[in-house]
Amino acid sequence: VRSRGLGDVYKRQILLCMVFARNAAMGFNRWADRDIDAKNPRTAGREIPAGKITPRAALAFVIGNCVAFVAAAAWINCLALWLSPVALAVLLGYSLTKRFTAWSHVVLGLALAIAPVGAYIAVTGSIALFPMLLAVAVLTWTAGFDILYSLQDASFDRSNGLHSVPARFSAVHSTLISILLHVLAVAAVAVLGALYRLGVWYWVGFGLFTAVLVVQHVLYRPSRIDRIGASFGLVNGLASVSYAAMSIVALLTA
């Protein structure tokens, strides 16, 4: 919303940064985890284990997108350029964290939390409290749902020496940790709305976001891990899209 005064080329560079960063992160995850994915029945059909893409081609894709991301960041402003290697370190580093820490979910949350901060830097050339609060919400929301998603791989992770919250703790305790993180996410979203007086439409989005998180924890209880699948992504997509849409409406009508 703050970018309404920017030129089309400038907006295009911000969009390209998002695409290149996501391509690099997803590609590196598939490349780094190719041997692990081949052992897991849930992921054995992914492109590299299935032989659809060679590891060398995947790595070339990652490198190309990393270079393109830095170049696009340089076009935006100096602060974006200087921070682009930090962003890439977090985005790519996440894929290695399951090898040594159960809290890889938090690193994934941090990787996604970079997005609102990066977008704010791209538009304003500075860092402020507003995007930081939004980043906290994204981090805790993402870490919370990733813990739930990882419940289905808990046994595999334990048997293969991989680390995750579900692999370390019981399903019940993992779910409680997820709930706590989602409470923090809801709190961050509420503080953001109250602090900046974002209006009624924002609070509609807040209500929808909170409701979807509650429904998620009702649907995916420890006793119903089998429900986690394609619908899991849809549920979390509804949470983010509804909150984002209502927030944009609130800012446009303020």
Regions found by a protein language model. Give the residues of each.
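Alpha-helical transmembrane segments
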Residues: 11-18, 130-141, 202-205
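Central hydrophobic cores of alpha-helical transmembrane segments in multi-pass inner-membrane proteins
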Residues: 18-27, 88
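Multi-pass membrane catalytic core of lipid/isoprenoid biosynthesis enzymes
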Residues: 12-19, 34-84, 159-200, 239
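Membrane-embedded alpha-helices of multi-pass transport/permease systems
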Residues: 24-28, 143-155, 159
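Intramembrane alpha-helical segments
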Residues: 16, 46-134, 214-221, 227
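Small-residue-rich segments of transmembrane alpha-helices in multi-pass membrane proteins
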Residues: 108-121, 168, 233-247
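Extended hydrophobic alpha-helices typical of membrane-associated regions
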Residues: 191-254
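Single conserved hydrophobic/aromatic residue that forms the stacking wall/gate
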Residues: 1-10
